[in-house]
From Swiss-Prot:
Belongs to the RecR family. One of its GO terms (biological process) is DNA repair. PROSITE patterns: TOPRIM. May play a role in DNA repair. It seems to be involved in an RecBC-independent recombinational process of DNA repair. It may act with RecF and RecO. A zinc finger (C4-type) spans 56-71. This is Recombination protein RecR. InterPro entries: DNA_Rcmb_RecR, Rcmb_RecR, Rcmb_RecR_Znf, TOPRIM_dom, TOPRIM_RecR. It comes from Granulibacter bethesdensis (strain ATCC BAA-1260 / CGDNIH1). Residues 79-179 form the Toprim domain. NCBIfam families: recR. GO terms for molecular function: DNA binding; zinc ion binding. SMART domains: TOPRIM (SM00493). Keywords: DNA damage, DNA recombination, DNA repair, Metal-binding, Zinc, Zinc-finger.
Amino acid sequence: MGGPELEQLIALLARLPGLGPRSARRAALRLLQQPETRLLPLAAAMQNAARAVKTCRVCGNLDSADPCSVCTDPSRENGLICVVESVGDLWAMDRAGIYRGLYHVLGGVLSALAGTGPDALNWPALMRRIESSRPSATPVTEVILALGATVDGATTAHWLAEQLRPMGVSVTRLAQGIPIGGALDVLDDGTLAAAMRARRSA
């Protein structure tokens, strides 16, 4: 139905996160019903992004500039590096607007199940960044491990903290616990335990 071109469009859309075959079919229909205002501008924007966007050689962010706009922002606190698993995590942290330091994208987490070891992660570049900052006026003094609250995230944070400690920087982790608006009776035991351990003065 619709020919091979339409089926290819639907199949490619269905590969996107959050879109299954039915959602992809609806999206394709919307795009094709208004090609001048939806489909063609989207296609042009995707081509422009494919040509212009690159991976930042410093932190691993995606940007049209290399180094990226975060790494070159003079208002950032150069003494802080927040380590995240993915570019999506970097964008989420930055969108929250509570952190004004630099970032480092690890590119994954250690996972015995998936066979992901230290060699697959971008941690040597983090060590080089810390080392090369030492002669500057603003050396890296703290590394914040902002990895997911999963077994793999916790394992990676523990392993990375062990690698970082000999470098003489403060290594911290994000507190974990009760989300804003979360009711206690619907939280799992692990979340409640983490919240209790991360309690602070009221």
